[in-house]
């Protein structure tokens, strides 16, 4: 019984030594393949170096080289950072830097957002937009030029003058239209949205309600004018009446004139008598 236990113990011990030797040989092979490889990799690294960081990544992670001064460090990320695009290969998932003028990209030849000062057009970053397109400084993209669009004209309005449809022969009529699409910076300007033309209609008398305030005002002015005219006529007639003398006034006037003549004659006689003496 004791012999069996001792033999089992030695068998287990030999098996553990065998596993340890296998792990050691695997580590020596990895060190030969990747010099300076650290066995304590972190941050998603499958293999790594104390000097260069990650050398390979765990499945589904992307490998990217980050420059720190003159040194490049390998990093494993779940997605590529801004300015890089990801490509999956059978043995590695890799992040590759976009072009110099591109901020974010889908692949090497298709940019989705340009850096400041460039305009995006069909996946490329341009200094200026091609002919037939214009730059949108808000989205920093080359967009189509938009021209103004207007609706059809409305029917002509009724012939009117000073807001009324009666009391005149010559007036004006108007028609309008709406702007359906406003133009972009380089688009054609919008046309006028209203037109007015002269119209001639058969004169018709305004009803009391149609005369309105202006009609009442004209009527009031007419009445005031007639009243002033009547006042002027009455004052003229009074002046004329005052210039005509009544028979009594004429008789008194003649009597006064006779008295004046008698007094004059009497004075002349007295002067002649004094001269004779």
UniProtKB/Swiss-Prot annotation:
Q: Which domain of life is it from?
A: Eukaryota
Q: Where in the cell is it found?
A: Secreted
The record places domain TSP type-1 at 147-207
Region (Disordered) spans which residues?
Answer: 210-277
- Which SUPFAM superfamilies does UniProt cross-reference here? Growth factor receptor domain, TSP-1 type 1 repeat
Write out the GO biological process terms.
angiogenesis; blood vessel remodeling; branching involved in labyrinthine layer morphogenesis; canonical Wnt signaling pathway; limb development; positive regulation of canonical Wnt signaling pathway; positive regulation of non-canonical Wnt signaling pathway; sprouting angiogenesis
- Tissue note: Highly expressed in endothelial cells.
Glycosylation is annotated at 36
Entry remark concerning the domains of this protein: The FU repeats are required for activation and stabilization of beta-catenin.
Keyword Signal in annotation: yes
- Which SMART domains does this UniProt record tie to the protein? FU (SM00261), TSP1 (SM00209)
Report the protein's function: Activator of the canonical Wnt signaling pathway by acting as a ligand for LGR4-6 receptors, which acts as a key regulator of angiogenesis. Upon binding to LGR4-6 (LGR4, LGR5 or LGR6), LGR4-6 associate with phosphorylated LRP6 and frizzled receptors that are activated by extracellular Wnt receptors, triggering the canonical Wnt signaling pathway to increase expression of target genes. Also regulates the canonical Wnt/beta-catenin-dependent pathway and non-canonical Wnt signaling by acting as an inhibitor of ZNRF3, an important regulator of the Wnt signaling pathway.
Q: Which GO terms describe its molecular function?
A: frizzled binding; heparin binding; signaling receptor binding
The main location is secreted
Q: State the Gene3D superfamilies in the record.
A: Hormone Receptor, Insulin-like Growth Factor Receptor 1, Chain A, domain 2 (2.10.220.10), Thrombospondin type-1 (TSP1) repeat (2.20.100.10)
GN (gene name): Rspo3
Its keywords, alphabetically, are: Disulfide bond, Glycoprotein, Heparin-binding, Repeat, Secreted, Sensory transduction, Signal, Wnt signaling pathway
Q: What is this protein called?
A: R-spondin-3
Bias (Low complexity) occurs at 232-245
Q: What happens when the gene is disrupted?
A: Embryonic lethality due to vascular remodeling defects. Conditional knockout in endothelial cells results in impaired developmental and tumor vascular remodeling. Mice show endothelial cell apoptosis and vascular pruning, leading to reduced microvessel density.
């Amino acid at each position: 019984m004791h012999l069996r236990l001792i033999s089992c113990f030695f068998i287990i011990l030999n098996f553990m030594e065998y596993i340890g030797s296998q792990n050691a040989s695997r580590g020596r092979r990895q060190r030969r393949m990747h010099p300076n490889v650290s066995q304590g990799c972190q941050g998603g690294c499958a293999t790594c170096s104390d000097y260069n960081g990650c050398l390979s990544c765990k499945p589904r992670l992307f490998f990217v080289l980050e420059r720190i001064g003159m040194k490049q460090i390998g990093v494993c990320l779940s997605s590529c950072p801004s300015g890089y695009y990801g490509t999956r290969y059978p043995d590695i998932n890799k992040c590759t830097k976009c072009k110099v003028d591109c901020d974010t990209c889908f692949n090497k030849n298709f940019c989705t957002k340009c850096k400041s000062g460039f305009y995006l057009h069909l996946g490329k970053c341009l200094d200026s937009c091609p002919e037939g397109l214009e730059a949108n400084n808000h989205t920093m993209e080359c967009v189509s030029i938009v021209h103004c669009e207007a609706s059809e004209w409305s029917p002509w309005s009724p012939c009117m003058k000073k807001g009324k449809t009666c009391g005149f022969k010559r007036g004006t009529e108007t028609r309008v239209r709406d702007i359906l699409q406003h133009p972009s910076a380089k688009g054609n300007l919008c046309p006028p949205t209203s037109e007015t033309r002269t119209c001639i209609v058969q004169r018709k008398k305004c009803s009391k309600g149609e005369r309105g305030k202006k009609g009442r005002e004209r009527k009031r002015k007419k009445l005031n004018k007639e009243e002033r005219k009547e006042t002027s006529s009455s004052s003229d007639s009074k002046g004329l009446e005052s210039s005509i003398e009544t028979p009594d006034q004429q008789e008194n006037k003649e009597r006064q004139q006779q008295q004046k003549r008698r007094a004059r004659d009497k004075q002349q006689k007295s002067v002649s008598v004094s001269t004779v003496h």
